[in-house]
């Protein structure tokens, strides 16, 4: 008995699968849009006024070019303020209500200098005030990464995406400061951010579910420049 060519059976995607895929895509898109607003330079936390000690590092000749800036920022992401902020953000995201204030106190105690404490406190206070006014979410007064993590949890945002975009915002703000101080051109600034993009994503992924046990810092030169900035004679940034 002759047999013809095999009959290819095709099945349309199940309606439930399509619905779930569309819902997940829409949720992720909404998360991106919400985080783009929360972490935008236009969000009134005054991020433009803080250099995280970068101003002193530049004035002392430690950062003179795009490559030296990129190296400095990489250290912050892997060993310094960027990483520790991401740890605190994720710890706040997963914290029970009664543990948020102790976590915030720990974050404040972890600040390496008076200016670092001021930087995280004032940005956090402004963030909390704006979130309460716009979204009706009362966060109290929390330092910046704790406030962002807490708001993201309440708004049911994706924690890994929140961490990655927070780190990208952190890098973008310091790059903008360096563009004014070194100075660097706008194209060099954009290339620096692109070079660090994958590191932001990788660190965000690595720190999912992080707790205070994961908190550490070994970017000591950044901490020292932050301390020196307090007595720097001529400066345009608050930290």
Positions of the model-derived regions?
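Metal- and O2-centered redox machinery and metal/ROS homeostasis
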Residues: 2-239
């Amino acid at each position: 008995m002759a047999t013809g060519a095999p009959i290819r059976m095709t099945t349309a995607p199940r309606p439930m699968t399509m619905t779930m895929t569309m819902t997940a895509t829409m949720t992720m898109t909404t998360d991106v849009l919400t985080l783009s607003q929360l972490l935008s330079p236009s969000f009134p936390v005054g991020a433009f006024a803080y250099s995280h000690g970068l101003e002193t590092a530049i004035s002392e000749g430690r950062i003179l070019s795009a490559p030296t800036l990129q190296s400095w920022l990489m250290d912050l992401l892997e060993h310094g303020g960027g990483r520790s902020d991401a740890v605190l953000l994720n710890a706040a995201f997963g914290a029970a209500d009664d543990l948020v204030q102790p976590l915030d106190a720990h974050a404040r105690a972890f600040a390496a200098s008076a200016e670092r404490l001021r930087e995280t406190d004032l940005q956090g206070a402004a963030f909390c005030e704006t979130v309460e006014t716009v979204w009706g979410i009362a966060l109290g007064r929390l330092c910046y990464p704790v406030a962002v993590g807490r708001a993201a949890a309440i708004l049911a945002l994706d924690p890994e995406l929140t961490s990655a975009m927070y780190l990208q915002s952190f890098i973008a703000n310091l790059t903008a400061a360096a563009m004014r101080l070194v100075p660097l051109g706008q194209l060099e600034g954009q290339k620096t951010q692109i070079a660090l993009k994958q590191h932001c994503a990788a660190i965000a992924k690595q720190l999912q579910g992080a707790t205070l046990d994961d908190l550490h810092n070994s970017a000591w030169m950044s901490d020292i420049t932050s301390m020196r900035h307090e007595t720097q004679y001529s400066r345009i940034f608050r930290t």
